[in-house]
Curated annotation (Swiss-Prot):
It is found in: Plastid, Chloroplast. The lineage of its organism: Eukaryota, Viridiplantae, Streptophyta, Embryophyta, Tracheophyta. It is an enzyme of class 2 (transferase). The gene is QS. Residues 17-63 are annotated as: Disordered. Residues 1-41 form a transit peptide. This is Quinolinate synthase, chloroplastic. Iminosuccinate binds at H263, S289, Y372, I373, N374, S394, H493, F494, E495, T518. Pfam families: NadA, SufE. Its cofactor is [4Fe-4S] cluster. Catalyzes the condensation of iminoaspartate with dihydroxyacetone phosphate to form quinolinate. Its EC number is 2.5.1.72. GO terms for biological process: 'de novo' NAD biosynthetic process from L-aspartate.
Length: 711
């Protein structure tokens, strides 16, 4: 289970709005013609398409303050006796709502995230008040639009921003029948669109420029790519890989029986080559860290004699250990650098501070240590000897912890090392504590309001560890997203800071966001694209990518594949997918004359035509000012290194010794092999994934300490 199920179970949970802060400036580029910045004009700049006040807003209602109008609207639907009555009220309001003209029923005015087509237009009139008009091709959705227009047409921009979505929660249950939950989010998405236009009106009134959009890539129905902004251009360069390099790699892989497992966060050049090569050699797999080792085992079973790992060192260590456990000790495992390929998160778990955290856990029985899989095998082994340990991923951590609390009475759970993920888990459980028992049961059937409140003081998380990539999604980036992209689909890795997490969780409550693993993010994008393709109506889907930019290659490949699979004899709608990179101008660097910013020399010529490349001047890949460029450690896995390793295999002259993945012959403080003890928490996780229960051996270890459970 990923955390997206929480939002589905609790549509009434809405994070409080963040306070506005100054936005960041970005290098100029041309905005998307489909969804550019909204032009909102006040008295000094009349609109070429003035909106007349809605006929649905009666004179006596207009005189009321917007807050009272909102309260009356909410009360009307709160006291409505049943869903059928509420639907009748919506249809009656829809009948009174004026239709928009064809000139306003265009892609730029579409409200994303609605089952039906919904259009919203807004402007600031001469009196400094917002004038709204809306329309839909669905009568129920038109009813929701009419509700919002009647409540907020004529309000001052600040009054529109003051509306709390929680105040309109009674509208959420107004629709009945199939797709009711999705259609009921229409009012929420329309409100977000109104508030976006109100912010733009305030900025125009104060003389503040709209600000440059984030860089983005737009994937057309024909698979063509349009890059907007120099950062996006740098990302797009390698999405159409060099055919000669692809052929060279495939030839070597096939002749020498080499398999490749790579993480999503690889360099775009490498991912582009791998994606193209996979069409000719099946033993290439790009994924998150969870399934890299499993994929390597399948490749060994299929006859691969070598596995090359494109990731950080703990990933190659895990591949080596799991292959040994599976009986493939003769299969060679190779890294992509003779130097250490580190990870800030893994380093945090090997610190003395983390050891102190575990010792504290060992003094608080019964305790279970839930450790993020993105840590070294040695760390897992040493931790498991101090406290019974199970690994987790960003997609199963919530289910793992909830099951542990349900299965072991009085348990203390100690999560680490990612501090942001730990804080986000605690935030999730606090949200669950105010849900109904029925809503909680949808998340985990063994829990209710009482059990969630009881476990909160027994959840502990390490507070001094984080991924340098996800650390960069700070408040400045969040403010810009809120200002310009609040109506877009928001995606966020579970490791992002709390502000980005809260913003994405709010979007999840209205079907517009996902918080989870890299695979969860990819699936979210694919699912929304499939829905658009099934509707076969012109559309522009805009996704803010709240994780490492290296995912773009896999996203583009998946989008292109879906576009190809939906080609039919009937006329295809013009559907586009836009991926927005929420990076600051400090998260890119000017190209230099004497350096290629740690890129291979083979790529320097290609970069001559690009003015910036991902990565700040220090070469770390991310900026402390907010926004992520890329993981510097992952970018050590270059195409040149991959080709070098492949060409030199088999390594008869021992020139690749420094590239071999570590095989742990070292022993733990209790005298056991690191590889053996370090693999056990991973095997516990696999058991949980297969059965949805913690293994008896682990439960016995937690409750009784040493020894095996009796059958």
């Amino acid at each position: 289970m990923d955390v997206s199920s929480l939002a589905a179970a609790a549509p009434s949970l809405v994070a409080p709005p963040l306070h506005h802060k100054p936005h960041l400036a970005f290098p100029p580029h041309h905005p998307s013609p489909a969804r550019g910045s909204i032009g909102v004009r006040c008295a000094h700049s009349p609109s070429p398409h003035p909106l007349r006040p809605s006929a649905a807003t009666a004179d006596e209602e207009v005189s009321l303050p917007p807050s009272l109008r909102v309260s009356r609207l909410a009360e009307e639907f709160r006291v409505s006796p049943d869903a059928a009555d509420r639907a009748r009220r919506l249809l009656a309001r829809a009948a009174a709502l004026p239709r928009l003209g064809e000139a306003d029923r265009v892609a730029a005015n579409r409200v994303m995230g609605c089952v039906a087509q919904v259009w919203l237009v807004g402007r600031c009139d001469g009196a400094g008040r917002m004038r709204f008009a809306a329309d839909s091709d669905s009568e129920l959705s038109r009813g929701y639009c009419a509700c919002l227009v009647s409540a907020l047409d004529g309000a001052r921009p600040e009054e529109v921003l003051d509306v709390d979505p929680a105040d309109l929660a009674p509208l959420g249950g107004a629709a009945a029948g199939t797709g009711a939950r999705s259609r009921a989010s229409t009012w929420h998405n329309v409100l977000i669109g109104m508030q976006k236009r109100a912010r733009a009106a305030i900025a125009a009134r104060e003389g503040r420029p709209a600000g440059e959009p984030f860089p983005s890539l737009i994937i057309g129905r024909d698979g063509a790519i349009r890059a907007q902004g120099t950062y996006a251009e740098a990302q797009a360069m390698f999405l159409s890989p060099n055919e000669s390099k692809t052929s060279e790699l495939v030839k070597s892989l096939r002749e020498k029986k080499i398999g490749i497992v790579a993480h999503f966060y690889m360099d775009p050049e490498v991912q582009g080559i791998l994606t193209a090569s996979k069409k000719h050699w099946p033993h290439i797999h790009i994924s998150d860290s969870l399934v890299m080792a499993d994929s390597a085992v399948k490749m060994a079973e299929a006859g691969c004699e070598y596995i090359t790992v494109l990731g950080v060192d703990f990933m190659s260590e895990n591949v080596r250990a799991i292959l040994d456990q599976a009986g493939y000790s003769k299969v060679g495992v190779y890294r992509m650098s003779s130097d250490q390929i580190g990870c800030s998160l893994a380093d945090a778990a090997s610190s003395s501070a983390y050891t102190h955290f575990l010792k504290e856990a060992s003094r608080s029985p019964p305790s279970l240590h839930v450790i993020y899989i993105n840590t070294s095998l040695e760390t897992k082994a040493h931790a498991h000897e101090l406290v019974p340990t199970i690994t987790c991923t960003s997609s199963n951590v919530v289910a793992t912890i909830l099951q542990a609390f349900a299965q072991i009475p009085g348990l203390n759970v100690w999560y680490g090392p990612d501090s942001y993920m730990g804080a986000n888990i605690a935030d999730l459980f606090q949200r669950m504590a105010v849900m109904s028992d029925e809503e909680i049961a949808e998340v985990h059937p063994s829990h209710n309001k009482k059990s969630i409140n009881a476990l909160l003081p027994r959840l502990h998380y390490y507070q001094d560890g984080n991924c340098i990539v996800h650390d960069m999604f700070g408040h400045e980036v969040v403010d810009k997203i809120k200002e310009q992209y609040c109506d877009a689909f928001l995606t966020a890795h579970f490791e992002v800071p709390g502000e980005m997490f809260s913003l994405s969780m709010e979007a999840k409550t209205r079907g517009m966001g996902v918080v989870g693993s890299t695979q969860n993010i990819l699936d979210f994008i694919k699912n929304h694209l499939m829905e658009a393709l099934d509707r076969n109506i012109d559309d522009h889907l805009q996704f803010v990518l709240g994780t490492e930019s290296g995912m773009i290659t896999s996203i583009v490949a998946a989008v292109r594949e879906l576009f190809d699979s939906y080609k039919t004899s009937q006329q295809s709608a013009n559907i586009e997918v836009e991926i927005v990179f929420p990076v600051s101008s400090d998260a890119v660097s000017n190209t230099s004359v004497n350096g290629s910013h740690h890129l291979d020399s083979s790529t320097v010529t290609d970069l001559d035509n690009v003015s910036v490349v991902p990565g700040v001047s220090s070469g770390e890949g991310c900026s402390i000012h907010g926004g992520c460029a890329s993981c510097p450690y992952m970018k050590m896995n270059s195409l040149r290194s991959l080709l070098k390793v492949c060409h030199q295999l088999p390594d008869r002259d021992n020139r690749l010794v420094a590239y071999q993945a570590s095989r742990f012959n070292a022993k733990t403080p209790l005298g056991k092999l690191v590889a053996e003890v370090g693999c056990e928490p991973i095997l516990h996780m696999r058991h949980f994934q297969a059965t949805k229960r913690l293994p008896d051996k682990l439960v016995h270890h937690v409750i009784h300490g040493k020894g095996e459970p009796t059958s």
